[in-house]
Amino acid sequence: MKIKKIFNQNAVLVDDGGQEKVAIGKGIGFDRKRNDLIFDRDIERIFVMEPEGQIKLQNLLNQIDERFLFAAETIIDHAETVLMEKLNEHVLIALTDHIAFSAENINNGIVIRNKLLREIEVLYSDEFSIAQWAVEYLTKELGIPYTYDEAGYIAIHIHSGRSGRNNNHRSIREVTIISDIIHLVESELETDIHSEPFSLNYSRLVNHLRLLLQRTHAQQYAVLDTEIVEMVKRKYPESYKISKKIRVLLTKEYQLAITKEELGYLAIHIERLRSAIVQTNVNNHEEEKN
């Protein structure tokens, strides 16, 4: 293998039989120049990607310490073992960049809170569990105090790297929309629905919203008889009113349209939550009297 480009003293671009690869090794680029030979004994890790990914990785290695790349690789290996599936190659670059960027913020005393953390934990529970492990690993391995909020961001990267899943932008958009809806529901019901008495109904609502968004994206809408929708409107007027406000939010802020059937289905889930809140308030009142 011959050196084509030196990124830093521990990372170089090599030509291996006409194929470009990124080679990592302690001191591999030190006191070397273009066309110098590199041997297997010099290499700790080697990365082969599609041309676009290779260029992005090269640009990244020009700017960051390669230990962030190694850490991201370890997290991905762990994720693939737990999930029993391969992640796409692009997640390595995105996760490396994120870990390095977060480290810079932390070292500068900047802590970015993840306002979508609760929704991410419910929507992507498998990925979130892996991300929690990753936060502990990063803190120990790099000596940088990554926060619990970081698990949410890492979970999104892992989710976007899974085969056949949404890309990172779409995953974040999905969580953001659901978070906005949850805030609207909390405002209407005047209750923190994340709290313990309502955790099950909260999880059910979040999962329903995820499926609703997926159906809307695929234009495969829920089937609900017109009679059932009308019954829901009569029987659960408050919840149906909230579902209509959600439709306005989706249309105005995200240019998403949902059908009357989806509206009725959503109202049923909101009513389940609203009823739980009412019952909890009654129980609390009874306890206060006693």
Predicted regions and their residues:
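A cross-family "folded-core" feature that marks the main globular domain of proteins
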Residues: 1-290
